[in-house]
Amino acid sequence: ERVVKAAADTVKRKIARIVLLGDPDEIAAKNPDVDLTGVEIINPVKSPKLQEYADLLYELRKAKGMTPEQALETAKESTYFGTLMLKAGDVDGLVSGACHSTANTLRPGLQIIKMPKGVPLVSSFFLMIAPEGGNQYCKDGAFIFSDCGLEPNPDADKLAYIAVAAAKSAKTLADLDPR
């Protein structure tokens, strides 16, 4: 429910184009008070692009032993379908994790998008913007939190890498100047 409300609010504010994955009738029935105008809802199982995405997944994973039948079944899963949409260039980003475990969120990304060369580990971050614009800890009100939960026992080098990666992401995505 909170994901659907957030999607509707994002579209209403004209922040982004949103695509929800799931059964449109089920999503509407579970969220009768949410105006889904402008929110695209795609059912992976019934999508005309399912076979195209399954073929893409098969090509990427056949060396690991995946069969075309396994690729088709796997592509029906929302985390894989969304990641395949991203790989195919049909969407610009993917938000997952509210309804899926970290492992089930990351696995498709690592298998389909893959790690760039020279990137030694997966890390994450989030931004928090203080409502009044600032406080005693941060004059502009923007906070960057790096989540080391993906790397349970990082050494000093890994911690430094995580901090630099979060700072670069904040600069790229939000035009912040981390310090």
Question: Residue spans of the language-model regions?
Answer:
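Anion-binding alpha/beta catalytic cores of soluble intermediary-metabolism enzymes, centered on
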Residues: E1-R179
